[in-house]
Amino acid sequence: MTEYEFSAELVFWGDALDSKRLADDLHLTVTQSRVKGEPLRRPDGTDSGSVAKTGMLSCECSSQDASLRRDPEGQLRVALGALKRLAGPLRKTYGVADAELQINVYYRDKTGGDPDFMFPSELLDLLVQHRIELRITVLP
């Protein structure tokens, strides 16, 4: 059987993005957040001399449960639950201009056909409703 890890993240961008409110409503672990015009920091915490051109919020769908790293459907259910908690339309309520559900599948061995998983239809409906693009990347 092929060893793989699955990573799903919801990523939001917008000049008027209310990342604090959005993160609070999603109840997911924030992996990155920045506010338009805020100084960008290097990994060591020092000022890079640049400022964020737009707001951004990235949240992962697996960090609260390590067993989800190999459970695509589990992570998609986490994303579904997070989107169901939203108080209203992304653009109007949170200032979101663009959004993606980013999915990465990392394989140790290249074997076609693994993993096999289903997208919950209710998740797909919410992605369309909120105009969230779906991006899938498969990496060796």
Predicted regions and their residues:
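Acidic (Asp/Glu-rich) sequence patches and key acidic residues
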Residues: M1-V138
